[in-house]
Structures are given as C-alpha cells and as structure tokens.
C-alpha cells in the first residue's frame, strides 16, 4: 500500500516534522503489523530521525550541518549553485525503514521523523510504503 503526501517547505533549509503524516497513513492502511518505508524522491531533500521534544535540537542540527557543509563555496562547479544541498541530502539519506506493531508506528520516546529541506522553499513529495509483515 502506497501513500503520497505533498509538503510545501517555507525556508531555504528546514526540518519539517512529518511523524503525524506517517502515523495517519499507518492508521488508514489498517495494517496491524507491517514493514514501513518512507522516502523522499529528491536529490536536495532528505529524511532523518531525531528528537522532537525540544525545537532547539532541530535548530542546532541545521546550524551544525551548515557549519560542516556551507551553503556558499565559490569553488563549487555545479551551475545551479546548490551542490551544498546535494551533499547534505546525501549525508542524511532519502529513505528510512520503520516497524508497525499493533497498528502503531514504532518510535522511541523522543523520536520524530523529519523531512529535511536543503534547497527550498519547494514542494516536496513524501512516499510512505506499508508492507504486510
């Protein structure tokens, strides 16, 4: 079963909590026990799992990734000027597996699932595939 969500990001770089969208898809699927794959089919966006209780964690992650891979590097050769976004996306990855048990998405107490925007604002697709266990 495949679900697709559209997310309009608002900033050049952001982390959008998509946990509830994924939980909603799990409920709609009616599956009790399943394997779940979440993917973003983009080369300048990614997915990550991280703390969702304190918004400062997201801010710190974005600040630190910008420090590691600065947006502006005059030695980049890619004509579009977004090589930084491709690299950041590659570091995070575009697909993550999850488990559904007793009809619920299994996450740790503080875990949330984030769509990471590195070349926004843009309209992004989030693909949620739910497979019977």
Language model: regions and residue ranges:
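Active-site histidine-anchored catalytic micro-motif
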Residues: 1-133
